[in-house]
């Protein structure tokens, strides 16, 4: 199984940490790829940040489908 874990903010350090945590608990044979959008806020701390993160998040979800991930 291939899982694309999408951090909705653009902070790479957080994305890397999320990926490490997910890989630690993933079943054997599961590939976890952690990504963050190329556009959006560095953190999500309110409604405005949520709205600003949505376009980049949706772009990553669509890309995951095209890339053949089993789950995003």
Task: Describe the role of every protein-language-model region.
Residues 54-72:
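Glycine/small-residue-rich loop that forms an oxyanion/phosphate-binding "nest" at active or ligand-binding sites
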Residues 1-58:
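N-terminal glycine-rich anion-binding loop in soluble enzyme alpha/beta folds
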């Amino acid at each position: 199984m291939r899982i694309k874990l999408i951090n909705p903010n653009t902070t790479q350090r957080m994305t890397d940490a999320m990926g490490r945590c997910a890989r630690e608990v993933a079943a054997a044979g599961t590939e976890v790829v952690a990504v963050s959008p190329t556009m959006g806020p560095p953190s999500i701390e309110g409604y405005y940040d949520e709205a600003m993160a949505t376009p980049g998040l949706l772009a990553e979800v669509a890309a995951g489908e095209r890339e053949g991930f089993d789950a995003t």
